[in-house]
Amino acid sequence: MSDNLCGGLPPEICEQLNKEEQFIKIKVEKRRYGKEVTIIEGLSGSDVELKKIASELKSKLAAGGTVKNGKIELQGDHRERVKELLMKMGYPESNIIIIE
């Protein structure tokens, strides 16, 4: 991140402020043959950053997944676990919404 976006704040503080401004929605969709897919939307950042987050989630959840159209898709129903992992990554609990 450039210093212009954060007014000269250190990058760590700038990154945390960015995380606090994001509202993340976690939902499950049923796909073909009754397969469930957890969809995480509302994360801002480049495709590279989203792929990094997706990669970390996939390894912690032992699930497959991908990044499509600015959303992370994970195979299976992982709503609660994804919320816990995102909170450990520094996203505030109040900004993470699980859609039933």
UniProtKB/Swiss-Prot annotation:
User: Does the keyword section mention Protein biosynthesis?
Assistant: yes
Entry GO MF terms: mRNA binding; translation initiation factor activity
Please report which protein family the annotation says this sequence is part of: Belongs to the SUI1 family.
Query: Which HAMAP family does the record associate with it?
Result: SUI1
Taxonomic source organism: Sulfurisphaera tokodaii (strain DSM 16993 / JCM 10545 / NBRC 100140 / 7) (Sulfolobus tokodaii)
Name of the protein in its database record:
Protein translation factor SUI1 homolog
Domain of life according to the entry:
Archaea
The record's listing under Pfam families reads:
SUI1
Entry-linked InterPro entries: DENR/SUI1_TIF, SUI1, SUI1_arc, SUI1_arc_bac, SUI1_dom_sf
